[in-house]
Amino acid sequence: MKTEIHPNYKAAKISCASCGTVYETRTSIGDINIEICSACHPFFTGKSKLVDTTGRVDKFKKKYKMQ
């Protein structure tokens, strides 16, 4: 590698604002704050909700008399 053309690669902490989990990694950016991480995101924790749209479809059809 050529010297003095690459950015400084240093240890950094990625901290989640939602749950407070801190991940340690190496990056050229520095410390990073994120809103949500895999430890608290509903998709990864298995607490995701299924949105039921059948009521919306029926309301639309009734509104425009499509039945």
UniProtKB/Swiss-Prot annotation:
Keyword RNA-binding found: yes
Disulfide bonds: none
Residue ranges of the TM segments: none
One GO cellular component term: ribonucleoprotein complex
SUPFAM superfamilies associated with the record: L28p-like
GO molecular function: rRNA binding; structural constituent of ribosome
HAMAP family linked to this entry: Ribosomal_bL31_1
Primary role: Binds the 23S rRNA.
UniProt record similarity statement: Belongs to the bacterial ribosomal protein bL31 family. Type A subfamily.
Protein name according to UniProt: Large ribosomal subunit protein bL31
Organism per entry: Leptospira interrogans serogroup Icterohaemorrhagiae serovar Lai (strain 56601)
Lineage: Bacteria, Pseudomonadati, Spirochaetota, Spirochaetia, Leptospirales
